[in-house]
Amino acid sequence: MTRGLAPLLPIEFHKMGSFRRPRPRFMSSPVLSELPRFQAARQALQLSSNSAWNSVQTAVINVFKGGGLQSNELYALNESIRRLLKSELGSFITDYFQNQLLAKGLSFVEEKIKLCEGDNRIEVLAEVWDHFFTETLPTLQAIFYPVQGQELTIRQISLLGFRDLVLLKVKLGDVLLLAQSKLPSSVIQMLLILQSVHEPTGPSEGYLQLEELVKQVVSPFLSISGDRSCSGPTYSLARRHSRVRPKVTVLNYASLMTTVGRPLNEMVLTPLTEQEGEAYLEKCGSVRRHTVANAHSDIQLLAMATMMHSGLGEEAGGEDKHLLLPPSFPPPHRQCSSEPSILDSPDELELEDVASGSQEDSELNCASLS
């Protein structure tokens, strides 16, 4: 058997080696051999990205001009933006929308308002804001739904653009003073909504100019300068309680903010985090989102409630030794409310049980005597 296998080995190796073909000159690397195919694929991808972005740009400008989306156009735009996010342009979509598309679209809105003078300008501004807030803004959010902003969402970017490129350029200072008696409610809504949007870097010059406009139509008004000191009804109420009951530790809004170790203006003007886009929904699923817009007011109410309840407790322990319960109101909307109740602590629930038990005993005694 060894004699039969020995002569076959060189023949097999010779056959296997016969299939090898020499590589052409200058094509020894496999990367260089596939370079033309890579270049063709890259050019096709760039053409696809350009066509997708052109369709998005055309749709956005059409929305600013007052037009709408056609049937199934929103789905096609979302798919185009998803392809753009996976391309080299993905990291520049938000910047390009803010600096190019939004600026170009809002220029049409500004020109429409500047054509009118006096009271007519206020009426046109109210109409423009109603259309922008109810039609344009939701459509922009729907078109750029796949985009997940890093610092600002599409909604915040659009509102800041309307503030800087439309409202502050039409110069409404003198017009607002003359038209205060017949000022449309849409203008007041516009000023308050724009005031609620803050830049990540803190209050800018545009925000300070907006505050000057809000002061003319909203009273009372608490500006950035007013936040530096505890003034107004809150301060007078805290001072009155501290004078009557010197032992009570007053927990006010200013001390609560300073204990955190951050400046008060920085805390109050910190922009609210709005989570949008598909990345956030994939992370959270169907969890209900709660707003934090009233976080500071909730802290202030909690501080005042704590101060008042502690003061009532001291009065009860001083002379009469009576058990004073906090006023309990029937919660008709408790099942639908997402805000925590201050009066739902375990100790207060026990006090309510004791009070209800004593009330039942007194009723039984009265029934036995009768």
Swiss-Prot record:
Q: Which residues carry this modification: Phosphoserine?
A: 28
Q: Which UniProt keywords apply?
A: Phosphoprotein, Signal transduction inhibitor, Ubl conjugation
Q: How is it modified after translation?
A: Ubiquitinated. Ubiquitination by RFFL promotes proteasomal degradation of PRR5L thereby modifying the substrate-specific activity of the mTORC2 complex. Ubiquitination by RFFL is stimulated by LPA/lysophosphatidic acid.
User: What one GO molecular function would you report for this record?
Assistant: ubiquitin protein ligase binding
Where does the record place the region Disordered? Answer: 312-346, 351-370
GO aspect biological process, one term: cellular response to oxidative stress
- GO cellular component terms given for this protein: mitochondrion; TORC2 complex
Q: Which InterPro entries match?
A: Bit61/PRR5 (IPR013745)
PANTHER family per UniProt: PROLINE-RICH PROTEIN 5-LIKE, TARGET OF RAPAMYCIN COMPLEX 2 SUBUNIT BIT61-RELATED
* Quaternary structure and partners: Interacts with the mammalian target of rapamycin complex 2 (mTORC2) which contains MTOR, MLST8, PRR5, RICTOR, MAPKAP1 and DEPTOR. Interacts with RFFL. Interacts (via C-terminus) with ZFP36 (via C-terminus); this interaction may accelerate ZFP36-mediated mRNA decay during stress. Interacts with RICTOR.
Please give the function described in this protein's UniProt entry: Associates with the mTORC2 complex that regulates cellular processes including survival and organization of the cytoskeleton. Regulates the activity of the mTORC2 complex in a substrate-specific manner preventing for instance the specific phosphorylation of PKCs and thereby controlling cell migration. Plays a role in the stimulation of ZFP36-mediated mRNA decay of several ZFP36-associated mRNAs, such as TNF-alpha and GM-CSF, in response to stress. Required for ZFP36 localization to cytoplasmic stress granule (SG) and P-body (PB) in response to stress.
Provide the family line.
Belongs to the PROTOR family.
What is the protein's name according to its record?
Proline-rich protein 5-like
Please state the gene responsible for encoding this protein: Prr5l
